[in-house]
Amino acid sequence: MLIVGPTAVGKSDVGIAVARRFNGEIISGDSMQVYRGMDIGTAKLKQEERGGILHHMIDILDPDEPFSVADFQRRVTTLIPEIVNRGRLPILVGGTGLYVQSIIDHYEFTEEATDLELRSQLEQEADASGLEALHRRLAEVDPISAARIHVNDRKRIIRALEVYRLTGRRQSDFHYADSVRQPKYQLAPIALTMDRQELYRRIDLRARNMIESGLVEEVKGLLKGGYAPTLPSMQAIGYKEIVGYLQGEYDLARALYLLQRDTRHFAKRQYTWFRRDTRLIWFAADAMDRERLMEGIFDVVSNALGGHVERNINDGGAFR
């Protein structure tokens, strides 16, 4: 089972409802929720908000530990059969398109793998720190590529770092083209959407609530804990904006504005990514009441998985 869509659309609540109905376990497809101590800025559900449903791929790493989409794929492809063998339905819920697609299409990663969000982050790092700093960072992880790429070749420096962060492998190690295997799993592929202005209203409200709930204190704690602001995790949306505020670059009102703006831009990119996948069955979360929405989604799961899933309302039905 797959539940995707833009940030703030309500994926987590739908995932919990599906897990309750079909005796499922949730696998987070969010690239940032893997990090411990990064809770508010990643909109991570608290334990008491998870409805008693087992959630995986949350709080498994410290913020300074590297984690690529290839790492995610390796962990989740091991996790899925374990869940199935327990008689439960694996439910992949998330908005990080490349992470999700690496599972459902069983990507074999090579240097052609790409992630526009990561590339945008590297572009910002180049603007903030300069190309020489980025080139030195490349030399630390891939000295062969660094030797081949001129210190002023912005595009190639960023691309080499992008490949390394995505795949966990050096660009210089690749000698063949990217390939995508046939889908590995039988899917019930759900995507959530809503009116764009309503989504943006929810995004803006959530950003404000994050700050009111202690996001600034969370980021302060991470910095005091020794996590550098240049870490990939600390450059994520929700953290880089607060880091700028704490470093005196702007006031808190500006930080909130940037957080809201950057999250809206991210939602646009998520829409662009998921709209390319014609397998997804879209539901407008704001166009019907909750009961009708969930019944429609439950029907898709039952029809898509057929005899492999047993719908249950009262007696804890299982994935077969």
UniProtKB/Swiss-Prot annotation:
Keyword set, alphabetical order: ATP-binding, Magnesium, Nucleotide-binding, Transferase, tRNA processing
Record region (Interaction with substrate tRNA): 30-33
EC class (word): transferase
Pfam families per UniProt: IPPT
BP term (GO), one: tRNA modification
Domain of life: Bacteria
Cofactor(s) the protein needs: Mg(2+)
Catalytic activity: adenosine(37) in tRNA + dimethylallyl diphosphate = N(6)-dimethylallyladenosine(37) in tRNA + diphosphate
Binding locations of substrate: 7-12
Site features described as Interaction with substrate tRNA, chain residue numbers: 96, 119
Binding site for ATP: 5-12
EC number: 2.5.1.75
Annotated InterPro entries: Dimethylallyltransferase (IPR039657), IPT (IPR018022), P-loop_NTPase (IPR027417)
Gene Ontology MF term list: ATP binding; tRNA dimethylallyltransferase activity
NCBIfam families: miaA
Family: Belongs to the IPP transferase family.
Assembly and interaction partners: Monomer.
Function: Catalyzes the transfer of a dimethylallyl group onto the adenine at position 37 in tRNAs that read codons beginning with uridine, leading to the formation of N6-(dimethylallyl)adenosine (i(6)A).
Name assigned to this protein: tRNA dimethylallyltransferase
Species the sequence originates in: Heliobacterium modesticaldum (strain ATCC 51547 / Ice1)
Phylogenetic lineage: Bacteria, Bacillati, Bacillota, Clostridia, Eubacteriales
